[in-house]
Amino acid sequence: MRKIIFIIAVLFIFVSCEKKTKTQKAIDSIPVAIKVERFDKLFFETTPSNLGKLKHNYPFFFPSGNDDSVWLEKIQNPLWRELYTEVEKKYSNFEPVQKELETLFKHIKYNFPKVKTPRVITVISEMDYNNKVIYTDSLLIISLELYLGKSHKFYQFPNYIKQNFEEKQMMPDVVSSFSLKKLAPVTDKMLLSQMIYFGKQLYLKDLLLPDYTDADKIGYTPEQIKWCEENESYMWRYFLEKEILYSNDSKLENRFINQAPFSKFYLEIDNESPGRVGTWMGWQIVRSFMKNNNVPIEELLKMNAKEIFEKSKYKPKK
């Protein structure tokens, strides 16, 4: 009997690996060629006589009503020039990132065949960490000043924010921005809706960034992932006992969904926990749903939170 079970297990692994190989070959064969436009470099190296040409080629970066002197002053500003120097030092060779972008968009096109490869432009902006990457149907804009490394001298931010100012966070941030075009915004305050929304976003990263670690996908440290895994059952019991899954209390979003140094159970474990544990748990629910239901990704993204949760058969690991 044990021999039969062993043979079945081996066959299952073999079939799974063969299917994965076929899928990967199909993804690799998708033609994607990305040309990254280094607007940051063009802007800070332009001359007054060439500024008009730059404005013509990139009108969306030059709001009407501003005199050329505004842009020339920025180009010559010592602080902006120092920031540009640091970005150029880090990203003088952008080819590795370009290759990663091409790999990512092969995965995107495999799962979403109608998606067109956008025009990719890098910029240096105002360190708006809530908009590190902006994705539209035709444009992908990446703010390079927010990927210099968490210990960079320019970053005067709390650790829980600047820990994701690493180059390895660039592709996960692209997927986060891409997901905004695919996911309908949450229209209610129910905690479960928020959890499943971000769970879907993270599941997209499972599909589109298969070689990335869970820590990189969600923007945690490995230790924070370990904490969530070890306390999954405890957190889930807390959510059930406090009856907050279906609650519309707006405070829950700040306690368990939004960026924060830690999550707020109002218990001793708070200081040990990472922020956003609700998004991590929503991820596990969506993963469980996809494991137990044969649903295309486009359909998953349209489904409501209650249906996903009820059909997920989610049980935290002991």
Go through each PLM region and give its residues.
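C-terminal soluble interaction/assembly domains
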Residues: 247-318
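Acidic/His/Gly-enriched intrinsically disordered linker/tail segments
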Residues: 203-265
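Positively charged n-region of N-terminal signal peptides that target proteins for export
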Residues: 1-4, 19
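N-terminal mature-domain "stem" immediately C-terminal to a signal peptide or N-terminal signal-anchor/transmembrane
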Residues: 18-84
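Acidic/His-rich structured neighborhood in mature extracellular/periplasmic domains
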Residues: 78-228, 298, 302-305
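Sec-dependent signal peptide hydrophobic core
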Residues: 5-9
